[in-house]
């Protein structure tokens, strides 16, 4: 079964079980599926800037943390155990720019709430497994995002514990 058909089957099961409400129409569903999960402009810009500085990383690298927990950060520094996520303001409910949609609130409110809860769970799972988690909002200035990643890597490379700085 292809990846696309397995996603469609999983979506159909979720709709049938009531886990996720069915889309209102096929056109809207198609539009939402076209939204990128990875390779967004903020991700590409951050990756490019880090690469130019000489940092090497894995992109969308699947981490298996045990107990069936799988996580796929946007940027992963495997040797240093640093996971970087670039979060979209809408999808991850940015406190500055995240807005609740006014249409189909019955659908969006629980969905966005689940996204935020999943982010918390992922952060905790990674931390428990000894990983350092960095979350960058898509609206953050590129130089600030680069500085946050570089500072974390620098501190870890030189034996400083940065966990109390969050």
Swiss-Prot record:
Source taxon at top rank: Bacteria
GO biological process terms held by the UniProt record: DNA restriction-modification system; mismatch repair
Compositional bias annotation for Low complexity: 7-17
Recorded coiled-coil stretches: none
Swiss-Prot/TrEMBL keywords: DNA damage, DNA repair, Endonuclease, Hydrolase, Nuclease, Restriction system
Keyword Acyltransferase: no
Pfam families, alphabetized: Vsr
EC numbers for this chain: 3.1.-.-
Feature: compositional bias, Polar residues: 28-37
GO MF term set: endonuclease activity
Record bears the keyword DNA damage: yes
Ranges where the record places region Disordered: 1-41
Family affiliation: Belongs to the Vsr family.
Function as written in the Swiss-Prot or TrEMBL entry: May nick NaeI sequences that contain T/G mispairs resulting from m5C-deamination. If unrepaired, these mismatches can lead to C-to-T transition mutations. The very short patch (VSP) repair process counteracts the mutagenic process by repairing the mismatches in favor of the G-containing strand. This enzyme is an endonuclease that nicks double-stranded DNA within the sequence GCCGGC (C-methylation site unknown) next to the thymidine residue that is mismatched to 2'-deoxyguanosine. The incision is mismatch-dependent and strand-specific.
Name under which the protein is recorded: Type II nicking enzyme V.NaeI
Organism this protein belongs to: Lentzea aerocolonigenes
């Amino acid at each position: 079964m292809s990846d696309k058909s397995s996603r469609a089957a999983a979506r159909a099961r979720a709709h049938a079980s009531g886990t996720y409400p069915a889309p209102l129409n096929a056109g809207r569903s198609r539009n939402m599926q076209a939204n990128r999960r990875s390779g967004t402009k903020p991700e590409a810009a951050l990756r490019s800037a880090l690469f130019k500085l000489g940092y090497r990383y894995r992109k969308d690298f699947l981490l298996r943390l045990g107990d069936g927990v799988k996580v796929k950060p946007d940027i992963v520094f495997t040797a240093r155990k640093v996971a970087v996520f670039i979060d979209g303001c809408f999808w991850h409910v940015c406190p500055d720019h995240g807005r609740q949609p006014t249409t189909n609130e019955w659908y969006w409110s629980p969905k966005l709430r689940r996204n935020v809860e999943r982010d918390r769970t992922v952060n905790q799972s990674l931390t428990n497994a000894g990983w350092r988690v960095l979350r960058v909002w898509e609206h953050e200035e590129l130089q600030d995002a680069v500085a946050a990643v570089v500072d974390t890597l620098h501190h870890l490379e030189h034996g400083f514990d940065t966990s109390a700085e969050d």
